[in-house]
Amino acid sequence: MALLEFQGVCKIYNNTTKALADIAFSVDEGEFVSIIGPSGSGKSTILRCINRLVDATQGTVIFDESDISHASKKDIREARKKIGMIFQHYNLVDRLSVIENVLHGRLGHKSTISGMMGRYTESEKEKAFQILEKLGLVEQAYKRCDELSGGQKQRVGIARSIMQEPKLILCDEPIASLDPSSAKVIMDHLSNINRNMKITCILNLHQVDVALKYASRIIGLTSGRIVYDGPPNHLTKNKIYEIYQSSEGELITDVW
């Protein structure tokens, strides 16, 4: 069953720059999809159209059977409760502790006052610690986030996302700021979350080798258009060159 559908989506910035052109695809529940393409190809714009950080100029985005491209602010807030977001630069509150940042994943489910006062239930706190334990961070729970390494910060971002209990997790270049060893840890965690928790994942990646190893499906973008949509084992060197105008060897980042 399709969890997400793009139907003829276009996005034009400032009435001149076409970021997306007639994008059409669907994502079923449980898929692990990697979107690849050079900088400026439209990868981030696709994710932003899903969670309505930007509005599509034309076309329709359906998420969980609801048209979110034309939704009210209230309906957008409801949709965002089901969509976790993991950012390249973590988007954490550095002065707060790890556990506080993870609990922020529940803010969308609380009133403004409860959120501001940090009113979390004991079951929510217990769940946050369980998630941190699975991600190997429980010993860091009371550390400020600005004391963590980049890989640890990204795991906090993953934990916060899981805390939302999302149907979909969007990852915008989640390993771009990490060394190869930390990148592998992050990708392994995301893969395990997808398999074991049955959460659909869509990742924007520059690293072709990472997409080939982890994704069940790859979407290739060039100049705002889809030029490949299929399984990793059908992605040929010629198609990679078409996507990037570069050879496969130049796009390898050893994270095995």
What are these regions (language model features)?
Residues 36-38:
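The feature captures the beta-strand-to-loop junction immediately N-terminal to the Walker
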Residues 51:
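Helix-to-loop junction immediately C-terminal to a conserved catalytic motif
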Residues 67, 114-139:
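Conserved ABC ATPase "signature" region
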Residues 144-148, 152:
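Conserved ABC ATPase signature
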Residues 165:
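Conserved catalytic motifs of ABC-family nucleotide-binding domains
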Residues 169-172:
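Catalytic Walker B motif of ABC-type/P-loop ATPase nucleotide-binding domains
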Residues 180-182:
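Helix N-cap at the start of a conserved alpha-helix in ABC-type nucleotide-binding domains
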